[in-house]
């Protein structure tokens, strides 16, 4: 159906009344990533796509956006067979994609970012005034309020996401794919995004909403498709879905989504920060006079939008970043700027944010990574010189069994494991030392819902054993589910602290943006 025959969207572009993917197959060496998957999106609906890591979501959407090409199957737009060869081809067919990590140039303005890669209406001369005017028109239509003349670096995260949506609409997207669109947003920004998505759907756009947050899927979508192991499990109306039902469809078994925590049995202070300051990687203020106390037997959650000092906080405590002012004490001993080895020796363990950079050596085996920090311990060596490989393998096998790590053997290279199993290995190693203080930074980022459930249970068990746990996470659901207290960071400072007892999500959201 031609654009002149088809109904137009408010943006003046042709509507995609229906898009259907039938029998889609995609093979990679040794892997069947998509196994005869059927998926469709209709005009005016928000269709959620759920599944664990490796379930096939990204592969399916990359084929729809022209990044991959299906080995078998068919894509039809408005009942017409369509071959999508590249992202440019996808855009020409009215398909846009909003990536989880924004594809924007920070030093350029909003208008310049939107104009990138597009032909000017004036030949070799820039037409940024035309682009800016069109951006303002789209902003008014969809309530995407952004100043086209501002550079990207001056915009908040939620505003940058609006720029991505505006860019897709400017290029004529009738169908939008949104990959984890709420991952870095505050609750208020999520509410604003959902209003925009509902308006887009009401105006005739089709939307694919990829998320791991089940409550958001239930709130925003009309239908839900669940993938598992490269196959479609089912597609159901959202009105017939519940969180437990969706989780079971994703994993193939019942999943515990809410935890009954034992009453808090807090002990003495184990970790204390007093007016700690530090520089960021850019040489600017990373931490600004942060004070915090953490007692044994409690979990303190650190909430905040990414980039507000959380990484610097974890690194200052664990000896990986210089403290420029203030002090850090563990069990009453001043450990300010102590090396990591000294901190390990006094019972501090660390689950790092970047597991593949700071947590493991991917070219090493599972067993070698398990004893990475303790390989010189007397239980693994003779006279601290000769390594006892049999004892190392035995200890690693016990950890594999206890922490349900899926690996062919202790000699398997870590790079061959899934993200969830690598995270379990890091957790097993850090807990094997029976720590008094545990710093857990983004412990379930990029991890399947089944592995997330397991890691959460382990953290709660450590809490009950008396371990003092600092949980740093950008996932408010995780923070609220596990924490006894919640501190909020903004621009390198702790701007508020609340007891996690029927905590007000709106209050947390305001604190995360520097409000009161």
Residue ranges and their predicted role:
Residues 2-516:
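Glycine-rich phosphate-binding loops of nucleotide-dependent enzymes
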């Amino acid at each position: 159906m031609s654009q002149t025959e088809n109904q137009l969207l408010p943006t003046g572009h042709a509507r995609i009344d229906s898009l259907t993917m039938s029998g889609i197959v995609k093979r990679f060496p040794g892997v069947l990533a998509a196994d005869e998957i059927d998926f469709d999106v209709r005009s005016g609906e928000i269709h959620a796509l759920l599944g664990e890591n490796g379930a096939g979501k990204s592969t399916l959407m990359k084929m729809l956006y022209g990044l991959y090409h299906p080995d078998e199957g068919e894509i039809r737009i408005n009942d017409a067979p369509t071959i999508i060869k590249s992202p440019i081809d996808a855009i020409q067919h009215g398909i846009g994609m909003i990536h989880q990590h924004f594809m924007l140039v920070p030093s350029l303005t909003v208008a310049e970012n939107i104009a990138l890669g597009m032909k000017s209406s004036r030949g070799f001369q820039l037409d940024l005034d035309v682009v800016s005017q069109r951006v303002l028109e789209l902003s008014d239509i969809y309530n995407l309020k952004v100043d086209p003349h501002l550079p990207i670096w001056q915009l908040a995260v939620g505003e940058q996401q609006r720029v991505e949506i505006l860019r897709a609409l400017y290029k004529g997207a009738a169908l939008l794919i949104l990959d984890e669109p709420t991952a870095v947003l505050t609750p208020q920004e999520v509410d604003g995004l959902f209003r925009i998505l509902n308006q887009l759907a009401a105006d005739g756009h089709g939307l694919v909403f990829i998320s791991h947050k089940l409550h958001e899927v239930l709130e925003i979508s009309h239908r839900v498709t669940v993938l598992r192991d490269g196959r479609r499990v089912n597609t159901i109306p959202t009105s017939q879905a519940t969180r437990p039902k969706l989780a079971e469809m994703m994993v193939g078994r019942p999943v515990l989504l809410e935890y009954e925590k034992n009453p808090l049995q807090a002990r003495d202070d184990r970790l204390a920060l007093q007016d700690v300051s530090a520089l960021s990687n850019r040489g600017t203020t990373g931490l600004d006079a942060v004070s915090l106390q953490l007692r044994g037997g409690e979990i303190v959650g650190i909430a905040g939008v990414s980039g507000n000092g959380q990484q610097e906080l974890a690194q200052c405590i664990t000896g990986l970043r210089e403290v420029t002012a203030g002090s850090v004490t563990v069990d009453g001993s001043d450990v300010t700027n102590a090396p990591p080895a000294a901190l390990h020796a006094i019972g501090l363990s660390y689950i790092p944010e970047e597991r593949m950079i700071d947590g493991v050596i991917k070219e090493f085996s599972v067993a070698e990574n398990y004893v990475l920090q303790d390989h010189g311990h007397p239980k693994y060596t003779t006279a601290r010189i000769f390594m006892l490989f049999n004892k190392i393998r035995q200890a690693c096998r016990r950890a594999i069994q206890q922490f349900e790590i899926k690996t062919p053997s202790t000699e398997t290279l870590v790079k061959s494991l899934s993200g969830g199993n690598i995270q379990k290995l890091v957790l097993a190693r850090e807990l094997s030392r029976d720590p008094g203080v545990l710093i857990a930074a983004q412990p379930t980022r990029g991890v399947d819902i089944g592995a997330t459930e397991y890691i959460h249970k382990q953290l709660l068990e450590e809490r009950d054993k008396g371990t003092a746990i600092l949980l740093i996470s950008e996932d408010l659901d995780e923070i609220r589910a596990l924490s006894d207290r919640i501190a909020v960071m903004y621009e390198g400072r702790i701007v508020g602290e609340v007891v996690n007892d029927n905590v007000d999500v709106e209050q947390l959201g305001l604190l995360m943006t520097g409000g009161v």
